[in-house]
Amino acid sequence: MYTKDTIVAIATPQGNGGIGIIRISGIDALAIAEKLTKKQLKPRYATFCNVYNDNEIIDHGIVIFFKAPLSYTGEDVVEIQAHGNPFILNLIIKAALNCGARMAKAGEFTERAFLNNKLDLTQAEAVADIINASSEIAAKSAAKSLQGDFSKEINNLLEKLIYLRMYVEASIDFPEEEINFLEDQKIHSSLEEIYKVILAVKNSCKQGVILAEGITLILVGKPNAGKSSLLNALAGKESAIVTSIAGTTRDIVKEHIQINGVPMHIIDTAGLRNSDDIIESEGIKRAIKKIQEADQVLFVTDDYTNSQVKFSDIKEIIPEFYDQIPKDIDITYVHNKIDLLKEVPHNHANHIYISAENNIGIDKLKEHILNKVGYTNQNESIYTARERHVTAINNAFEHIKLAKEQLELGNGELLAEELLIVQEYLNSITGEFSSDDLLGEIFSSFCIGK
């Protein structure tokens, strides 16, 4: 069991509220709580009492003691439910510190839960995901990860992989046997099954990352092309000022929306043009910088000639900025103001036709965005995932392909080695083998009281 010092923190969000919760965890949690309350606390009982600093009453509320290991962290845990005034809560924190506790670091309660085997690393990450979920589907998916769906899939895969690796190694360890184990159809079928499962998990992880982290869309284009109108149309509200004056948007405007439950972070940028205006020029610099961070760029244009669509690329429309835009970035050309055309072309490839002002073609654009980012699975059975999960699964997938090659070549030792590498990558997902640096990075992203 993880039994270092005793930690304390406010577990509820900052600000005023009806109730504020303070969490204490560690070997001295009960002793500290009994000093604060001057009560003997029974495990799993709600005790209504005063909370003191020495002999001065700070507040009164409900105190619950969770005896190890039947607690969130696996240690002795006490939760004090007081009035949700920040000044009151901070006074209780100070009193707990005076009794020997220390302030918890970000995510330290969940880190202790992980180190005490109350949950694995994917479940620990799901705690943060469920707190930060920005859509209903994302919240449900995070809940599935928290209850262990993702972990079970990885562990079932590991079980099959380890069994196969042991079988292969047995063929290496007993060369005197006249049977060629590598020609055994059992190995071929088992390896093929593992390959297919890893491929399926790889695809699920990609969907899970989209739900957990969302998609960043950047709206760029020349001034007055309708970027702000498009932002408002996608958001379904007036998020940006729209005028006929070119250069109205001079800074970054952000909006968070959902498209079919997928979180989208939309950023409207200053129109790209050479400008003598200092503020507008700074906005254009920021726009170029944001383009480099985008998952997808929506290049908004109203470039028509004689009421006909002109198929120009970025190099033609804004040649002065072309060299500053990454060449590998995914760009969709959004042809706005189609209400001005006599005949509207059909959407094709990366060209979508809309009228932001009249809300024409917006649903088709949303559908196009989801397809471009690769979100196809809207099944509620999907779980959330992180970029590190995707990296680990991608690496495992590459090495399982190498394992298949070694099997075809009859190289038993190299086959076993590739299977071991796959196993290590899968273990890193659930935290079976994780470096201190990785753990520090993961838990530091949590809020203090979790």
UniProtKB/Swiss-Prot annotation:
PROSITE patterns hit by this protein: G_TRME
Cofactor binding note: Binds 1 potassium ion per subunit.
This enzyme's EC code(s): 3.6.-.-
Name of protein: tRNA modification GTPase MnmE
Record's subunit section: Homodimer. Heterotetramer of two MnmE and two MnmG subunits.
UniProt: K(+) binding residues: 224, 243, 245, 248
Pfam families assigned: MMR_HSR1 (PF01926), MnmE_helical (PF12631), TrmE_N (PF10396)
Job description of the protein: Exhibits a very high intrinsic GTPase hydrolysis rate. Involved in the addition of a carboxymethylaminomethyl (cmnm) group at the wobble position (U34) of certain tRNAs, forming tRNA-cmnm(5)s(2)U34.
Main location: cytoplasm
Compartment(s): Cytoplasm
Annotated Mg(2+) binding sites: 228, 249
